[in-house]
Amino acid sequence: MAARSLWRTRTKLLVVGTALCGGSGAAFIASSDDPSTTLKLCTSIPVRLYRNTVTAASIAFDYEYSLLGLAEGSSERAKVKHEVHLRSAQKLQELCFKNGGIYIKLGQHIGQLEYLVPEEYVRTMRESMLNKCPISSYEQVCEVFKKEVGEMPDQVFAEFDPVPIASASLAQVHVARTHDGKKVAVKVQHAHMTDTAAADTAAVGVLVNTLHRIFPSFDYRWLLDEMSESLPKELDFLVEAKNNEKCLDNFRKLSPHIAEYVYAPTIYWNLSTSKLLTMEFMDGAQVNDVDKIRKLGIQPYEVSKLVSQTFAEMMFKHGFVHCDPHAANLIVRPDPSGKRNIYGKRKPQLVILDHGLYKELDFNTRFNYASLWKALVFSDAKAIKEHSEKLGAGDDLYVLFAGILTMRPWKQVIDTSVDHLVIQGNKEDVSELQMYASQYFSEISELLRRLPRVILLMLKTNDCLRSVNNELMQGSSLESFLIIGKVSSQAVLEAKRAEKKSLMKWLKVWFEGFSVEARLWVMQFALWILQVRKSLTL
């Protein structure tokens, strides 16, 4: 009898508690500025957190159970680890698609960290995340317009195509025509992205931190920190618009010799807000569409050189770097001036899109990063160690850092032959690099933890550019490294000349500049010989 009474009391308390919580929640939702959005947040966030918890637990258990009792370094352990990596990558992929929003962005980040995370994760994310982003309905697009400008798309523009031409993790792009007849691209943020971003970031933090506690070698908290810092800026399209204009201004002021070959769309400020960005519509070929580039009368080789020089100038001279240069964000078109190269082919102009993610390098970081690349190109082991340590790699991981930057083993990095940094892109090279990433997973994770976040974004940028140049040059990388060597050397020398020095030190810098130019000329000539030999053997 007493037990039944106690049960009834507990039941009543549960009912009253549920009613109070439900009533309070309903009152909170009803009194909010946007009840429908608040309701969606209150129902979706717990579900996402639950999915994160289940996925993290499943991945952790799989690694712990599957690798139990397998000897470190054995072929059996390597085989099983590959299978676990693949299963875990697929679970993470499924989580990203189900949760959407910044989870897609996280998956895209992982897909671009080639040789920094296990190859199974990179391949799984790259095959899906870059081409299968969510699409907002036209009704959701109209909702964003109403909130931002108080009008529907067909009122703001003379014409507005309701079907997007492209969609990414944070936004999608529509073609429109202004009332004065200009064709424009309108970037529309996915509905409620800003509302869910903070909660999603916290939920992702639970996932990453949980995996790190279980597996200390899995330390990708830096990726979470980077997303937490970058995401608010990427979600503000007015920041992107300012980056767009600053990028072009830097080329005009600091790199006038290539300024006419680099372009970014004109921004229509009167038709832009933090969630709507209206810009000039750009025609051209995607940078990895080699066939279309050739049809435009442009040599892919010229495009590869322009891409390498453009981003080398950003990194080593401007200190203001576009950190998401994947193929969809780079368009090639014939230079509007009509200029041609010595072979009569049209010169390319590189159009850079999506300026939401930029990083600034302070003077010391930029100087050391430029000095490191100069040392890598010229096989200077002492300088590689010195500047790697100054960037945070330490005296125990500088060799690994050099390998990650160049994608070559140490013995090849310090080889003094002119083609020591060539990557042919064949299956043997790719397999070697993938094995390298898997074998040194713990060391790579520790290195990434040590390096400044801005350098981590430079690594991601390097991977994107390497992928683009591999497609343009069919795997050959020497020309790109020579351009990097030239621009990084110029940046180092400019920094040294800017210091107040004695006549003797000034002469030393002058001689260093002369020596660098001579070495680069010899390397360029050797490259020409290699290219002639290659053409004769075809």
UniProtKB/Swiss-Prot annotation:
It comes from Arabidopsis thaliana (Mouse-ear cress). Keywords: Signal. Pfam families: ABC1. It comes from the Eukaryota. This is Putative ABC1 protein At2g40090. Belongs to the protein kinase superfamily. ADCK protein kinase family. Residues 1-26 form the signal peptide. The keyword Signal applies.
